Amino acid sequence: MAQQVETARYEVPRWGKSQSCHFEPFGEQGGMMVVETEKTNEEKQRLWEFVTLDTSLYQLRSDLIPLPDKLTFFDSKSSPHWAVFLFLNEKQQRSDSVVFWAVTYNRSVEEYSTFTGRLPERSILQSMALIDGTLMLSVNNKGGGGFLSQYDLNHQRQRTITPNIGNDFILFQFEAMPASKEFVLAAREFVDKHYKATRFFVYSHDGRVVQSHRFENGENAGLGRMCFAFDTLHRLTVYATLERESNRKVTVEGMTADFSKEVVGVTWIRFAAEGTQAKTYLFKNLPDIDRALTSSDRLRVKEELLKMQQGKKKEKGEITFQFYAPRLVDFAGHHVFVAEAFQPIYHTETRMDYGYYGIYRSYPVTYTVFDGYDFFSEILLTFDDDGELLWHTSVRFENALCDRLWAHAYEAVAHDELLVASPGEHTLRYEVFDADGVQLLNQQVMPMDFMYGTDSYDDEYDAGLYRWYGNSFLVHGCQRVQNPKLRNTRRTVFYVQKIQYE
């Protein structure tokens, strides 16, 4: 069961809605919290606080680093010797080139340094990855095409890498593979503005191409979000969602941030010297997949089955999901592909309009209002080394509607068990599975402790969870807490809290 660690909670006051706060874990060496403060220096630069914490979430060190005002935190990555925190100026004009600032932390000598970079006009910084002292940024040009910007942190050198793709393309996903010290890039290839194929490149840590592959799209279907792995023979294996594609021409702007595509299945791909192997599993062919559906979709599936039994329909319709970024977990010698399903929720409102002067006969005007995203289910599919689907299951957490997309759940292996957990409303909900996909525990709900005994929960935003080290996890988010015993009876804080699974 999950157990809390007494007093292992760290809080930072939240002073504004746009304030940034982020925690970068360093494993058994603790971690670092980066907080945007209200303070500025004489040059009107914003002061960011970098707080070093140990594994008990005790503060070891605090440093204030000035950066230009109105920056937003983009992302951070860490390796055994380095940590990099990237910031962007999102208030710049659309015609301006993209300027970023990076704060690097040399963990070996505990020293900070900063550098700034300028990307081409109207380009889009997609993602960042770090292996040892090599930082890579993947950048898309607004009209198509892209490049990798490589930074050698040890020798302060930079160079640009452009993938060798003949047709139009965009960089879709880019990830670091720390075990092999390589980077994997997936780029979408377009012919006459139609998504035709996905190109895969494996780069060494110094930027050399060591593998290059191409996967052609099927009829009306293409690869969506994906995860990467290498088998024992160092062959690239891809676990990807399968998205339905129309024959209409597309625009590449904003495509990497588009999560609205309907996913109809999952595709397993292995690139080998003897040829490419691929296996596709459609959701409509998976037994018991209806448990992962919303109530309205379950009703639709039951009606279809009834029509098929009555001979009124010959073929089962597609079962589709919208997925947030999938994840891959190594469990019992197999790979578990996990994706969170969500749907946007709307409601309609009607008001009466009486014309400009209010003298005409009234008439109703109906419009749609966006309520938020509902993360209603998490789907797990387990594959062996040859791409055979061993088992699948789903987990449902009752989540409040949210106004943006972020990961609501997390999966990890602890004590030879697969733990699926999700924080929410100052509780931790979790389920446990064995290597055969058998549920060992029904969904458990564990209340979490506060900083003080007289604290009480008021509200929560952006709650998340991730693996820290060993069997320890970190719950993080933003909370509004009440305490009648304190001078300020209500406080809003960013927090991190340690949880152990025993």
Regions picked out by a protein language model, each given a short descriptive name:
Residues 3-70, 255-262, 280-318:
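Start-of-domain marker
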Residues 6-14, 57-65, 110-118, 157-165, ...:
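A short beta-strand motif characteristic of beta-propeller blades
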Residues 15-25, 67-78, 117-130, 167-177, ...:
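Repeated scaffold domains used in trafficking and secretory/extracellular systems
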Residues 17-147:
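Post-signal peptide N-terminal segment of secreted/secretory-pathway proteins
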Residues 24, 28-43, 80-94, 131-142, ...:
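Short beta-strand elements that form the blades of beta-propeller/WD-repeat-like
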Residues 47-55, 98-108, 148-154, 196-209, ...:
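Beta-propeller blade signature
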Residues 213-225, 277-320, 393-410, 437-470:
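Conserved blade-ending motifs and adjacent loop-strand segments that build the rim/top face
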